[in-house]
Amino acid sequence: MMRFTLPRDIYYGKGSLEQLKNLKGKKAMLVLGGGSMKRFGFVDKVLGYLKEAGIEVKLIEGVEPDPSVETVFKGAELMRQFEPDWIIAMGGGSPIDAAKAMWIFYEHPEKTFDDIKDPFTVPELRNKAKFLAIPSTSGTATEVTAFSVITDYKTEIKYPLADFNITPDVAVVDSELAETMPPKLTAHTGMDALTHAIEAYVATLHSPFTDPLAMQAIEMINEHLFKSYEGDKEAREQMHYAQCLAGMAFSNALLGICHSMAHKTGAVFHIPHGCANAIYLPYVIKFNSKTSLERYAKIAKQISLAGNTNEELVDSLINLVKELNKKMQIPTTLKEYGIHEQEFKNKVDLISERAIGDACTGSNPRQLNKDEMKKIFECVYYGTEVDF
């Protein structure tokens, strides 16, 4: 038996934030990131709508990029003191991911990260609170997914938590929030969304339920990402919806080694998640094409790329990704990103071992061992061809 899970309600469109005034509840904890939502006036809007709904609100502010276990535990403690019946997270992937993990430890203070680090080990939630997510970036799609990524900086380990219990109850996908993204963030989050859609389409758990969502997302991202990077508002809106569709796909089909690699190098080398995915994606497509040639070729055909054979179509898809990276000033290798060679050599065995153990590796369409993972990392560092 397989399962397909989404939030109960997704409100979308410009101005959909207003839906918050219809929320039923008594107390809400609002979890925020670095301050951009306040600067652009969206926090005041949310507070105003929640006041109309008669809901008392407290804020948790300053969730850092790649949130830490410490941030999660502090937030969970504040929730236990305030006892909200709604947890509302607004911002990029980081505050929403952090709020999901806070939710777990708010409802289950006896648990530790070791208890929930394996997929589908999160206990039942919603005994104390429901969860509403409002994304401001067009990439992570954590507003519709069963995932949350939390970092333990002391051990340099990223925990990709995975459980349908942490799928939000409500998502508000208002593209006005995404209009505030700077170009670099637009590029990184957009490539994250493209990676989500492509990996979901070839993942071992892809299905007739996830394939249309993934393919529609790929088509929309192909059409709108670069225009969005250049600041086109209509393209920003379409990218906000595309990343959400990609999220619905990968939350159910799961991902692959592009994300495994990004998780582990994000923790060790501090590469922004979307940037890491963008760098790895061409190399991973090449590696996986040994077993998924037809699936990748189908993507290339659907977006009208050149090629008379499956091999030529897949090469066109790889070149499309490379061209997008180039146009949006994303490095093509880890060396170009700025990681020193000796540091890479010192850490490559560690990150290879950890990437093999990542939750996303199991659903990659081509299975691999630590030595093969290391070889891919080396190809990505030096920019050499994946020919194995």
Curated annotation (Swiss-Prot):
EC number: 1.1.1.-
Its biological purpose: This enzyme has activity using butanol and ethanol as substrates.
Molecular function in Gene Ontology: alcohol dehydrogenase (NAD+) activity; metal ion binding
Cysteines paired by S-S bonds: none
Provenance organism: Clostridium saccharobutylicum
Gene this chain is encoded by: adh1
Keyword Hydrolase among record annotations: no
Keywords: NADP, Oxidoreductase
PROSITE patterns: ADH_IRON_1, ADH_IRON_2
Family of the protein in this entry: Belongs to the iron-containing alcohol dehydrogenase family.
Keyword Transit peptide tagged: no
Name under which the protein is recorded: NADPH-dependent butanol dehydrogenase
Classification via Pfam families: ADH_Fe_C, Fe-ADH
Source organism superkingdom: Bacteria
